[in-house]
Each structure stands twice: as C-alpha cells, then as structure tokens.
Amino acid sequence: RGYLAGLGIQTAALAVAGYKPPSFALSNDVEQYDGTSWSEIAEINTAVAARAGAGTTTAGLVFGGTPPTTANTESWNGSAWTEGNNLNTARAYLAGFGIQTLALAAGGGPSITANTEEYDGTSWTEVNNLATARQQLAGNGTGTAGLVYGGTTGSQTAATEEWTVPSSISNVTVASS
C-alpha cells in the first residue's frame, strides 16, 4: 500500500489504510507489526489515504486524509476503531505525532497550510501555526516535544520546526538537503 498512516514503535506498530496497488483503490486494511512479522487486524471505519497517525498499538489515533479531503479522526483501543471528533480543518498530506490523549496535526494540503491543531483525547484545538506552511511533511515525538520537517511549499523544503509545550512551535532551522 501507499500513502498509509503509521503509528507505534519499532516492535509494535500499525500500518493504516492507504491506496492498494496497482489500481490505487482505497483500502481500510490495518496491519500490526510485532517486531518480527505483520498480521491483519480490525479494519478502520473510513478508507482514505494520506492521513497522519499518533500513539501506540493499544491507544492510537489517525486523522485527516483524502479523497475527498477530510477532517475525519478515528481512535484505536487495541481491538476496535471508534469515530472521534473531527479536525477543525480538513486536510491530507499532514504530519502527526504524539499520543492518543495529546497529539498534534501539522501542515497539510491540498491547499498548502501552516495550520496546527492539538488533540486532547476528545477534541481538536487550533494552536500556533507552523512558521513554514507545507504539505507532505513528516513528524515525530511526544505531544509535549516533537519535530516536523521536510515537505513541500510548492518546492521541496528542508525546514525543521521543533514543538515544545507550552511554547508551541519554536526553534525553526533549515537543515541542508
């Protein structure tokens, strides 16, 4: 699959939804990795691609995606997916990081945005925007400390932004590519 969401750690991860080759049909398949092998688990409710993920294999979260561009949020409790409150801004190709009760959604598209939202386990709240609006970026970290980096602003960028609570986005650097 391509354009799927991922969450978890090296020895316990989920690969969620995306497009199936060769037809690029949307998939609601979810697979779990145990550090050695992959196995299929309960399907997600909404089949979309290019969404972001946060959390663990027992307390996970996926959000955003396309087509169509959506604000959809679903949480995972280790055995089933549940619809949650939507992002305030529908988008795909965004970065996500954190845990199920403190996650961040940053950037995205298809209209390139700097929008950043924080999830508290129940709802999304708009917080400080990225310094560099972009989509197709990556992110990692906890809800209180993380990074977003790379992506496209219309052309590729190596911009890296550090997230810290309570100060929000700070310490913008541009790494060499």
Model-derived segments and their meaning:
Residues 1-177:
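Polar, enzyme-active/binding microenvironments
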